[in-house]
Every structure is written in C-alpha cells, then in structure tokens.
C-alpha cells in the first residue's frame, strides 16, 4: 500500500473533474424535480434518496434528497494519494462522521428540551478511527472501524449523572446508532446499461 511519503505528486498529469467543473464541492439544489429526480417513498418516517456516479478513479458525485425537508444537495468526495485519489474533496467516511455528530447533537438538544434541561455552549467533539491493511491492487485490502470517541462539553445546571444519562439515551435514540449496533447482511446490486450484473459473493439487493 502506498503511503503519503512514496505517493506521486497529487494530480500530476491526471484529469481532475471536480476542479475542472468549477463548481463548489457542496451546494444546495433549488429543486430535485427540475432534474427529473423523484422523492423517495416515506416508509419509515425519515427517507433519503441518493443518486451517485463515479467521475474518475476515486472521485464521486452525488445528489441527496430528503423527503422530510424536501432539500436537495450536491455532494462530492475524493480520496488522498494513499488510495490513488486527487484529494480534491473530503473522503467518503468524513460524511459518515459529520452525519453521526450532527445526529447526536440533534438528539441531545431534543431530549434536553423534553426534560427541561438548559444547555449552554454545547460542543461535541467526535473522533472516528478507521483501519486499512493490505493492498487494493492485490485484492488483499481489509478495512475496519474502531469504537467512536464522543466528548461532550456543555455549561448546564444538571448534575453529572443526569447529563451522562441524557447523552447516553440521546446517542441510542439516534438513527445512526440503530444502523451501527446490529450486524447487517450486506446487500449489493450492480447494474450496467440497465441490466443487472451477477456479483456472486454477496446477496443481491431486494432478494
């Protein structure tokens, strides 16, 4: 696996679609309907639909629409030289971290309001740790994730036990916690030119 020290200079002699487009890495879209993209069905109370495509080796572009707010955003991601990327946008796992801490913040504030606990200057500092061993080119790469560290800093009149209990319950109430705790069976579907390609090693989505 290449490291930062022995990787070639970023972008030398390679096309960089994200920079060439001249667009911001993230921006809000006025209307997803104008792009011919339909909102998802509301099956579980909070529905999000994502349309994504690959731009180059590691660059991805996505349009994300939330049924709850109707908001649509264009997002983009890239990787660094250690994965043969161009470092033109945040890596995909950065979006996971941002979504997690945002969800925790929302749940903490909602629970505090319900319990009439005043939160002043609430700050969450979250560290996510990921591992990567082996070579992507050789097909031996294995990725992993270590436990998340969440540090809560707040000025409040609540005692330590009440605050600790509130944060613990808020984290468990977060949708992302429901995604991370149980073991899931991977589902994957690969489609080329409208035809599904058999992948063999994992269960197909929808089956």
Model-derived segments and their meaning:
Residues 1-97, 110-207:
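Extended beta-strand/beta-hairpin segments
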Residues 103-104:
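Alpha-helical metal-binding/catalytic segments enriched in His/Glu/Asp
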Residues 107:
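Conserved phosphate/anionic-ligand binding catalytic regions in large, soluble enzymes, centered on
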């Amino acid at each position: 696996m290449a490291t930062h020290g022995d990787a070639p200079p970023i972008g030398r002699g390679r096309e960089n679609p994200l920079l060439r487009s001249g667009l911001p890495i993230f921006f809000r879209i006025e209307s997803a309907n104008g792009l011919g993209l339909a909102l998802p069905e509301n099956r579980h109370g909070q529905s999000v639909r994502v349309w994504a495509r690959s731009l180059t080796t590691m660059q991805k572009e996505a349009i994300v629409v939330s049924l709850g707010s109707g908001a649509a955003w264009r997002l983009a991601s890239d990787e660094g030289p250690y994965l043969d990327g161009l470092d033109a946008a945040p890596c995909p796992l950065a979006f996971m971290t941002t979504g997690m801490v945002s969800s925790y913040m929302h749940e903490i504030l909602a629970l505090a309001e319900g319990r009439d606990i005043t939160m002043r200057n609430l700050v969450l500092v979250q560290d996510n740790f990921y591992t990567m061993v082996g070579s992507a080119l050789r097909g031996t790469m294995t990725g992993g994730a270590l436990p998340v560290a969440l540090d809560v800093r707040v000025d409040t009149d609540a005692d330590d036990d009440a605050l600790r209990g509130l944060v613990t319950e808020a984290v468990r109430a977060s949708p992302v916690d429901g995604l991370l705790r149980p073991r899931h069976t991977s589902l994957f579907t690969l489609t080329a030119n409208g035809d599904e390609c058999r992948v063999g090693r994992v269960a197909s989505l929808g089956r």
